[in-house]
UniProtKB/Swiss-Prot annotation:
Keywords per UniProt: Heme, Iron, Membrane, Metal-binding, Monooxygenase, Oxidoreductase, Transmembrane, Transmembrane helix
One Gene Ontology cellular component annotation held by this UniProt entry: membrane
Protein's name in the database: Cytochrome P450 monooxygenase LUC2
EC annotation from Swiss-Prot or TrEMBL: 1.-.-.-
Pfam families given in the database record: p450 (PF00067)
Function as written in the Swiss-Prot or TrEMBL entry: Cytochrome P450 monooxygenase; part of the gene cluster that mediates the biosynthesis of the mycotoxin lucilactaene and the lucilactaene-related compound NG-391 that act as cell cycle inhibitors with potent growth inhibitory activity against malarial parasites, moderate growth inhibitory activity against cancer cells, and no activity against bacteria and fungi.
Superkingdom, taxonomy of origin: Eukaryota
GO molecular function: heme binding; iron ion binding; monooxygenase activity; oxidoreductase activity, acting on paired donors, with incorporation or reduction of molecular oxygen
Gene, per the UniProt record: LUC2
Main EC class the enzyme belongs to: oxidoreductase
Subcellular locations according to the entry: Membrane
Organism expressing this protein natively: Fusarium sp
Gene ablation phenotype (knockout): Abolishes the production of lucilactaene and NG-391, and leads to the accumulation of prelucilactaene A, prelucilactaene B, and two isomeric mixtures of prelucilactaene E, and prelucilactaene F.
Length: 509
């Protein structure tokens, strides 16, 4: 019998050049995948890089990578260091630099003034278009259309006039008094009347309560209770909003709601409840004005959802920026004891220690307490809330510092850099409030609240809150510096401390 070859042996002896059916299928699938990736993903990106390389702004100073890719700026934004990123570029390359394709930063004070004030360029759609709960219904902060913005601002402006803001002073003071009670409690529990207090938490809690009572008609009692779900949810939303300005694809993440369900329910219930009370009672707060102006009829420009969105912006942007300004002011004072003593002397002049029950009153002392205002101004010069400036957009081809800027380019008027230039300030990096008492101080480059038509509508509200808070705290308590803390800042919509807490020694005066 002749032995038959084993099927395995026979298979092994097949010519190596003869591909199997499986390998042909694998080869075809690989080619299809490579072709797909090349056409859909790689080729468009290569085209974009080539386009960026030949863009007019590629001639502007800055790293080559910034001109070709948005990733350096994106990474800085994710880390919260975009203001440091811009500063380092200006230090190396000069007053105009490329941040990313289609985005430049300008630190020249004459050009900053032209952009935000003289010519009043429109806000950048590339940035503020991603800062909206509803893309079709922006808030006052996120409008880029000038006519629509002007209409909304006219509607809201009466709420932020000095007269109406003064009428809210008594309810604002109830929140400040709660903070005083809390500090007294800490001092009672401290060693020999001295307590180490997380003043970052206390000041932010106070600012939230003040905005809460003026915007929602009732304090959120964060100072008394230590926390509240709404501020923590809004702070998380603020982080996402900061990222979405430069990373807009975040909003397309599956199952990510356009509104936080808790915030949406909370604000809707507040607004609906106030609407039902309109005929029976009146309130002296911002919510009253917002609800009175709203109308849910078809075609309305200001519906209940708009009231919700505007109130959320007021609560987040208003509390965050004001609290940070107050905290940074106290920090500057603690690191400059002579300035602190001079300010406390001014406080005692206007509110003598022999009259401890005298109520802090903006109408009485705000205009006269010039050194307090100088300390606040000097703090906001060095640490402005809008660290890189409010981004604007060229509506037509323009020339900035000799460089052509194509229409549609986002331009960051870097106000923080403009605030610290040797040409305008003696020892610009030093905290010297006295510089604001000089006659020429009114003509210096200074834009902590922006300028032009987009100047912050809440400016007077913020100053009143800062005055009430700082004067009351300095009347009642002595603050001392605690060494060894992280004082670096991050920028997420507003400039703030990187650390989650900042401690100070507190005792009664």
């Amino acid at each position: 019998m002749v032995a038959q070859p084993s099927p395995i042996v026979g298979r092994l002896k097949l010519p190596e050049s003869m591909p199997s059916l499986v390998s042909l299928e694998e080869l075809t699938a690989t080619k299809v995948l490579v072709t797909f990736l090349t056409i859909v993903i790689i080729a468009p990106r290569v085209f974009t890089v080539i386009k960026n390389a030949f863009s007019p702004i590629s001639s502007i100073p800055g790293p080559l990578l910034n001109k070709l890719s948005p990733w350096p700026l994106t990474i800085a934004t994710i880390k919260g260091t975009s203001h440091h990123f811009a500063r380092s570029l200006h230090e190396k390359y000069g007053p105009i630099v490329v941040l990313a394709p289609g985005m430049v930063a300008v630190a020249d004070t004459k050009e900053i003034k032209r952009i935000i004030q003289t010519e009043d360029w429109t806000k950048s759609e590339a940035i503020y278009g991603n800062f909206r709960q509803d893309p079709q219904r922006p808030t006052l902060l996120a409008y880029t259309d000038k006519k629509a913005y002007a209409k909304r601002k006219r509607m809201l402006s009466s709420m932020f006039g000095i007269k109406y803001i003064r009428s809210m002073e008594p309810i604002m003071m109830t929140c400040v008094e709660a903070a005083v009670r809390q500090l007294n409690k800490f001092c009672d529990e401290g060693t020999q009347g001295v307590a180490v207090v997380d003043m970052q938490h206390l000041i932010h809690s106070l600012a939230i309560d003040i905005i809460g009572i003026t915007t929602f008609g009732g304090s959120l009692n964060v100072v008394d209770n230590g926390s509240h779900p709404l501020p923590s949810r809004l702070k998380a939303g603020l982080r996402i909003a900061g990222l979405m300005q430069l990373i807009p694809w975040i909003r397309f993440i599956p199952f990510l709601p356009t509104r936080d369900p808790y915030v949406d329910r909370f604000t809707y219930d507040i607004v609906d409840g106030r609407r039902q009370e309109l005929e029976s009672s009146q309130h002296s707060d911002l919510l009253q004005k917002l609800v009175e102006a709203s109308d849910d009829s078809p075609g309305s420009d200001f519906r209940t959802s708009d009231v919700q969105d505007e109130s959320v912006v007021m609560l987040t942007a208003g509390s965050e920026t004001t609290a940070n300004a107050e905290l940074f002011t106290l920090m500057m004072l603690l690191k400059n004891p002579k300035v602190m003593k001079k300010l406390v002397d001014e406080v005692d002049q206007w509110y003598p220690p022999s009259e401890p029950d005298r109520q802090t009153d903006c109408g009485y002392s705000q205009a006269g307490m010039v050194y307090l205002q100088a300390c606040i101004d000097e703090t906001m010069r060095l640490v402005p809330g809008q660290a890189t400036g409010s981004p604007r957009e060229t509506s037509k081809d323009d020339v900035v510092l000799g460089y052509r800027i194509p229409a549609g380019t986002t331009v960051f008027p870097n106000t923080q850099e403009g605030h610290t230039q040797d040409a305008h300030w003696e020892e610009p990096q030093k905290f010297v409030p006295e510089r604001w008492l000089e006659a020429q101080a009114t003509n210096v480059p200074y834009w902590p609240f922006s300028a032009g038509s987009r100047v912050c509508i809440g400016k007077h509200f913020a100053f009143q809150e800062m005055h009430l808070t700082l004067v009351t705290l300095l009347r009642k308590f002595k603050f001392e510096y605690v060494d060894g803390q992280d004082e670096s800042t991050v920028f997420r919509v507003a400039q703030q401390l990187k650390a989650e807490s900042y401690r100070m020694k507190v005792s009664r005066r």
